[in-house]
Amino acid sequence: MTPEQQDLMDRAEQSLQAARILADEALFDVSVSRSYYAMFYCARASLLALNLSSKSHSGTISLFGQHLAAAGRLPIEIHRQLIDAERLRILGDYGGANSHCSQQDAQVLIAQSARFMQIAMEFLAQ
């Protein structure tokens, strides 16, 4: 693992830890955002293994889907989870007065981001 990949994985771990703490404090919108970022950092680190990167979130998600999930290098369902996590992050960060993430959203995303991180770590260890 390169130093840049390690830094991204460290950021992912910190984001996941923050997501858990925030969920425990019933701050579900912010928890969802941190879970998304845990997944996003893992996606970026994984793409670097193929010498790929993007300057945008949508570009990173697209490259991840094309070169890692659809190519069979990583499970396809984690790409779908990353897409769904971004949608929830946007809802939590920018949603209106009646648009908030639920406790269930936060709990599901924490579990998914922990699994995403484990899969990314195994991929990067190859």
Swiss-Prot record:
Gene3D superfamilies: Nucleotidyltransferases domain 2 (1.20.120.330)
Pfam families xref list: HEPN
UniProt cross-references to InterPro entries, sorted A to Z: HEPN_dom, UPF0332_toxin
Superkingdom of this protein's organism: Bacteria
PANTHER family: UPF0332 PROTEIN TM_1000
UniProt record similarity statement: Belongs to the UPF0332 family.
Name of this chain's protein: UPF0332 protein glr0978
